[in-house]
A protein has these predicted regions:
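NAD(P)+-binding Rossmann beta1-loop-alpha1 motif at the extreme N-terminus of oxidoreductases
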Residues: 1-50
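Short, functional N-terminal and low-complexity linear motifs
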Residues: 5-10, 58, 80-84
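Rossmann-like NAD(P)(H) cofactor-binding subdomain of soluble oxidoreductases
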Residues: 62-110
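N-terminal glycine-rich dinucleotide-binding loop that anchors FAD/FMN and/or NAD(P) in oxidoreductases
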Residues: 46-64
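Charged, low-complexity, helix/coiled-coil-prone segments
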Residues: 31-40, 56-57, 61, 106, ...
């Protein structure tokens, strides 16, 4: 069974992690608070350029307010928000992580 993965915060770090995990076949849900960004990801996927080249991958992206209605439980949740959003985002994400799930802090110190 494939692990269910959530990424809270889809800026530079969250986008990079989410795009690579999705490309490798993992079931990833991206959660972000910026509606236009969510719309763009839904319409265009994520485009990544790194030292190994470029790729675009379609992603499952949802807005924070839509995530509040989710019943899904995740095995792994990445916290990829700015430091000033850590507390509320961690509390928000907690209800979606399985009891034996893991939260990975992947903040970039901004």
């Amino acid at each position: 069974m494939t692990k269910q993965i959530a990424i809270m915060g889809v800026g530079a770090a969250g986008s990079y992690i989410g795009a690579h995990l999705t490309r490798e076949g993992y079931d990833v849900t991206l959660i972000d608070m910026w509606g236009k960004h969510v719309d763009a990801m839904q319409d265009n996927g994520l485009h990544v350029t790194d030292a190994l080249g470029e790729f675009t991958v379609p992603v499952k992206a949802i807005h924070l307010t839509d995530a509040m209605q989710m019943n899904q439980q995740f095995d792994i949740a990445f916290l990829a928000v700015k430091s000033y959003d850590t507390e509320w985002a961690a509390h928000f994400l907690k209800r979606f992580v399985k009891k034996d799930g893991v939260v990975v802090d992947s903040q970039n110190c901004m």
